[in-house]
């Protein structure tokens, strides 16, 4: 009975707790004030944790949504939420998601698959022929304003509600929908072509009868596929064989994870040993693989061959996989397909990023809702003044239709076209070459930023690693003393070579050392340097690649002498970490060169040209959790087995033997801005290694909890290791980082640096880059692990004023768990914040916290795959295409090539985009309000009749050819030159207050519209003769001229295209007068009376506004006008 009692019984009524893990932040926790962190359960099921995390994300919204009820909520989007919820329930009811399971795949026998797997077809299309029109219409009419215009247009089919010609209302709506449909159709055709091109690619499929050609879309689970060099891998596969003698190949993964370095993949040993390809069908073998998952960096599976006695079992890991969307870089590979279609890693990781909506769009939406309310109120007032006579509800709806132009239907089209123009200008700017706009809907966000969250490595720094320091505990070597290390290496290997050439003669060695005491010291230093350099040259995942080998030339790796191929000048090093490449290049510079590497051995070339061979027994790759990597090698000459390991100081401190210098020297190097690695070794006997190998192989064959079991076995070996050295690698700053950060700081942008590096290194880079000024105090947040410590440290931080904050990821996690609001409030008051040891999840969490607790816009910038979540979470994401690949660049809204380009991107293009869109939006709304004011005046004078003032082509032409081009030309306007905007970044600070588009400016434009509309209408009524048609001709012509003059008075910097737009619009109107005899009296509009009446009305409507603008600019000029003058 005792076996059935759980060790940690948990009552069902216990309070909700969160999974506590240093690698991922606990986001939400409900507990009492007196709770103790030590009383929390250490583990929680993955499902429970995900539920707990999602509860945190949805709980605040749930509380808010409870208050969002009623008519206002429904009109502002509640109807859309309700419809979407109903559709989602219907979809889930009709089509349940298939449960993913582990599977057994037989080599070359897809018919043996127990289940039906997805078709291997790439489908990025949103619609098909049947669903295109309904789908696009739904996407448009799910917005309230578009639905409103549709209802207004449909109302014209009702005779009692009809105001004028049908095309008066249907033509603008049709134009907007046509533009949208054409744009969607073009994008859909492009997606269809790309999908068809990818799905039609031919691959060689291995069958019993030989090779056959098969399309990518026809590949099935269990097929044996042959992939040539430089060919894309069509589906997720297990690597079985290769044409390379080494049994391995390189793949390029830049389209999968964004990393440009080649990755080494290893074929299954059992199938690699088969004599010919056809033998794959003569064996009975299968692979058992885990269910499809998102993680592209891990894999668990087993290979089994049954036709042997005993059966052969091999464990499979990430090194045996070939994921789809990667490219074979060397040789020809054969693999068995295990996942296809939507179950492939690349497809599962392709998620739709959130549709980012700019702050300006949200502000315009609020203004249009205010206009809608004003339209309804105005219609009610007109009906009330009419006395609610007759069918007043019908008249109410007719007035709503008459005043529908208050809400401009062309607003969205104009803004979208303007955004496209801004994107084109950004990409054509020669001062920021290589800049790409990937999200064209938010260029105005670049002009409203308050917080900039930046990565360090590769963003502020060049990601160009240079070896700078080697510390042995008692002696340190820098760049100016590397020749001493080189001389020690030459001496050490010269002695070894001399001893080997003289055989077992013992007399030759003392003859070289006539002074016993001194040589003992030199020998001690030389041997320590020798061991350290050898460990650095062996402990890595770097592979030397020669141009001749990549191109297919077969070199003999078994050569034991200095080979011509080994001295090839075209040798390059491939590795997933630039730090490792820097270390290997340094060992080459001091005399110990890595010349060859395959699956089983490493070869080093000594300064004398001798080739030393080391057999690779085991490799333990670097992971973000372990923060270290190791290798076990056997030296060919002596047979000695040595376990080498290197890693971060926090991971290695508890592994190496006791010492009194490691922690201090790590801090010293970090203060110099160096990235540190601790190197250690451990000698193993044959018995020790055999015992370890047996336990390790048994753990690797486990399907369940394999990683935990393997880690436990490896940790049993990581004890009392001998500390060899500490290395320091420098990552130099990007060009013009200091002036760029100074520019951003003067623009009122607060800069937060989020990095995974250690605290000392991050602080040093913050100082050297002038992120933190040298005379500014820095508060280093002490490590905290519980609520009490966090409370005390926050109180200490609260007493500091105007100081930069430096905090680690672990302490940040504790603060956010207990004092989220208080911490964010204090941190936002700091001029700069540095968060070190941050995980990618924490970076994104910090972005979301700033969005939730402040009303300001955030921008995230980075260059690596670990920055993608932060970039996608920010209001504006900027990616740098750098050494770590293109993943951040591809996921970002804007892509740049250097950090310094962000200055011009924000100060010039961001500022101009915001001010231009603000002016464009208000002008389009002004164009609708002025004609609605004229309609209101006209109806009020003629006994509140719901009769249109203008009909037919006049209304259509007014919103299109007569005024569209001059108004849209505002996207070319600029208040100051780009040089002045960069010289005076304080101009950018004014934009964050949103004064260019606010309720104040909106009310000013409303008053202008009422004044001008009243003047135009009353003037035309006062000056007209006996014919009503004269009122229409005078008022409409004056309206067109007023709009053109208002645009001209608003422009601050003229462009030749603006002049052309004005002339074209005026010419179009004058030319159309000959065809408007249905609306105008042609004999009247050619008289002088018509001309002077139009001129007087136009002058009265515009001149007072110009005088007021001139006086305001003279006595209270804006900041930009002071610079432009």
Swiss-Prot record:
Residues 153-161, 391-395, 950-951, 1023-1030, 1077-1088 are extracellular. It is found in: Golgi apparatus, trans-Golgi network membrane. ATP binds at residues 455-457, 580, 622, 627, 646, 675-676, 755-757, 837, 843, 866-867. Residues 558-567 have a biased composition (Acidic residues). It holds the Pfam family Cation_ATPase. Gene3D superfamilies: Calcium-transporting ATPase, cytoplasmic domain N, Calcium-transporting ATPase, cytoplasmic transduction domain A, HAD superfamily/HAD-like. InterPro entries: ATPase_P-typ_cyto_dom_N (IPR023299), ATPase_P-typ_P_site (IPR018303), ATPase_P-typ_TM_dom_sf (IPR023298), ATPase_P-typ_transduc_dom_A_sf (IPR008250), HAD-like_sf (IPR036412), HAD_sf (IPR023214), P-type_ATPase_IV (IPR006539), P-type_ATPase_N (IPR032631). Mg(2+) binds at residues 455, 457, 863, 867. Residues 1-131, 183-369, 416-928, 973-1001, 1052-1055, 1110-1125 are cytoplasmic. The active site is at residue 455. The chain crosses the membrane at residues 132-152, 162-182, 370-390, 396-415, 929-949, 952-972, 1002-1022, 1031-1051, 1056-1076, 1089-1109. It catalyses: ATP + H2O + phospholipidSide 1 = ADP + phosphate + phospholipidSide 2. It is a multi-pass membrane protein. Its cofactor is Mg(2+). GO terms for cellular component: endosome; plasma membrane; trans-Golgi network. Residues 500-525, 552-574 are annotated as: Disordered. The keyword Lipid metabolism does not apply. Belongs to the cation transport ATPase (P-type) (TC 3.A.3) family. Type IV subfamily. This is Probable phospholipid-transporting ATPase IIB.
